[in-house]
Amino acid sequence: MTGNADSGKIATEKDPRKLVFTKLEVSPVFRESPVKELPLFPPISREHSEAKDKTDEEGITSRKHKGCRCKQSKCLKLYCDCFASGVVCTDCDCVDCHNNSEKCDAREAAMVNVLGRNPNAFSEKALGSLTDNQCKAAPDTKPGLLSRGCKCKRTRCLKKYCECFQANLLCSDNCKCINCKNVSEAFQPPAFSAHNSPQVYRRRRDRELTEWNSCPAPLFSIPDNSIQNALGSPMSCSPKLPYRKKRSLMGYTSTLLPDLGDLCSLLVAASESATTTAEDQNRIFTKPDDKEAIELSSESESRNVEEEIQSRGRLIELIDVQYNGEEDSQCKTKTSVNETDIYMEQERAVLETFRDCLQKFIKSRLES
């Protein structure tokens, strides 16, 4: 018996694994214990899930984004992200918080006060957005959007700097972002982000202004009198405008070449002097003609008045027609003659001054 016992001990020492597996196969503990009765989750997680389901039934959603840090508002104003989105503060760094389930009265009073001033204060800032499947199922429904919108320029609304991205929202028409990518493929607003940005608006406005300026003005908008005066007026009005010199591209002007600005100013001055002399001569010669015309018109008026004394209205009309017709015809003939004389004098003076300038330039060129 002692020999058998010693042989069993030696066997266990030599091959322990074999004996262990045989014991596990024979052991009734593992056969009788069912695996389904083992708890898969700790009891803390169950309580948390049950509390979460209760809060969802009551209408209070759990907060998933970054908590607030209010210190003086007691989390009862729209400055607080939790209160503005209709969420109870959980795991926030706020001080003296009233936005919780313990102080529901103060929270409801603050919400009533805010809704009295702005009925859409909380509906426009509701957290959460629709998924692609929800958008396909109901394409007419829009997700909760921020009322003021973001103003991102470089992040493309894909970082936490963007208010919409931080709140898990899609960018809306109110946003003024550029190159935005915070948009779902199923739902895209008609006029979106970059289209309403100030830079694009300025470009569109400048393009419209250039097109409007490039279009010629319609003829009916310009009165006929202004066109006739502009065409019939002599060149005497041009010298009054100041001439502005332009610098050369190289930064200096050559001493040999004549300056175009000085040459133009000389020609304009010559034409102005010619117009003044021609107008003075016309005034001197037209004085006796004017007197004769006035006498003739007075005689014709007196004859018409004596003949048509019975009808006063007709008399006035006839006098006006005759007087205006004679005056217009005389003025037209005089103005046409005077204008031709003025143009001839201007041309002569300009050509003479230009000839003198060319002679001086040729002499200076030959001397150099």
UniProtKB/Swiss-Prot annotation:
Keyword Zinc: yes
Chief place where the protein resides: nucleus
Keywords: Developmental protein, Metal-binding, Nucleus, Zinc
Protein's cellular compartments: Nucleus
Segments forming domain CRC: 64-185
Entry GO terms, CC: nucleus
Keyword Nucleus: yes
Cleaved signal peptide residues: none
Organism superkingdom: Eukaryota
GO MF term list: cis-regulatory region sequence-specific DNA binding; DNA-binding transcription factor activity; metal ion binding
Membership in a protein family: Belongs to the lin-54 family.
Domain topic, free-text comment: The cysteine-rich domain CRC binds zinc in vitro.
Function of the protein: Plays a role in development of both male and female reproductive tissues.
Name this protein carries in UniProt: Protein tesmin/TSO1-like CXC 8
Organism expressing this protein natively: Arabidopsis thaliana
Organism ancestry: Eukaryota, Viridiplantae, Streptophyta, Embryophyta, Tracheophyta
